[in-house]
Amino acid sequence: MTTETKVSAALSYASKGWHIFPVTPNKKIPYGSLVSKGHLNATTSAAQITEWWTEAPNANIGLNLEASGLVCIDVDSYKSDCGFDDFIKDKHLPQTLTQNSASGGTHYIFKANSGDSYPGTLCKGVDIKYNGYILLSPSCFDGRPYDWQNDLEPAQAPDWLAKQSPKAQSLRHHCCQCTLSSNQGYLKSLPMRVGITRCLSEWVQWLPVVRMMKPFTVSQMI
C-alpha cells in the first residue's frame, strides 16, 4: 500500500462527510503528537488531513463514528462463542457497507438514527460502536490489513439496534412511566378540579349581589 493511496483514501472518506484522524501505524492508538484529543480531533478538512498524512505518511486511518453520523456493529466472528448468528436469526439485517477487520471480524457500518443511543454490547462477541472509533481500510493492525467486503453506501440503522441498547431501553421506559404517572395524577385530581371550577363560577355570579349587601354581625344571623 503506497503512501499516496493512504492519503487518497483518507481524503476520499472525508469527502463523504466522515470525520477522519490519524492513528499510530500498525496500531489502534491515536497518533498522539498530531491529535492531542484523540478521535475528538477528527475532521473533514482536506487541508488538515493532508497536513497530518504529510507529517505521518504511514498513519492508520481512524473514523470518529458519532461525529460522522455512523454506527458500527463489530462482530468477532472468528470467536467460537460469538452469538451473532443466533441473535440475528429473527431480525432483518439490511445490506450495508461492510468491512473485514484486521483480527478476522466484521464491521457492519450504518447511518445512525437521530436521537438514538448505541452504547454497549449487542450479544456475546458483538459490540455496538458509536461513541468511539474504528479503523478503515487500508489501515493495518499487527501486520494484518482491514479491507472492504463491498462498496455499498451505509444503510439506515435497523430499529432493533437501538432497542438493544440498555441506555435507550431505560430512557424509553422512564419516559413512558413519567407520561403515565403524569396522566394518572391529572385524572385523579380531575373531580376536585371540576368542583373548584364550579365553586368559582358560582361565586363570580353572586359577587355583584354580595357587594350590594350591608355588613352584618353573627348575632344578626341568629
What are these regions (language model features)?
Residues P22, S114, C140, Q169-I222:
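Modules that initiate DNA replication and primer synthesis
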